[in-house]
Amino acid sequence: MNIGEAVKLRILELCKMRKITVNKLATISGVTQSTLSNITGGRNNSTTISTIKKLCDGLDISIEEFFCSELFRHLEQEIK
């Protein structure tokens, strides 16, 4: 799995845990719905830390909590 896929799955997982929609997350985090739709739709594999920080703020979690998931433990090497 690459980092983009892991970020996408983590966002969807956190929305499910919080019982909110992706659109609601966009609203509460100040990220545009199109940006979040691109991430969760797999059309953006290079999400910035700044965007992830905004999402974390909207979810009231730290960046550390965001990345504290099995999804990020065994990522593919990006540079070969």
Locations of regions flagged by a protein language model:
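Short, charged recognition helix plus adjacent turn
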Residues: M1, N38, E65-K80
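Recognition helix of helix-turn-helix/homeodomain-like DNA-binding domains
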Residues: G30-S46
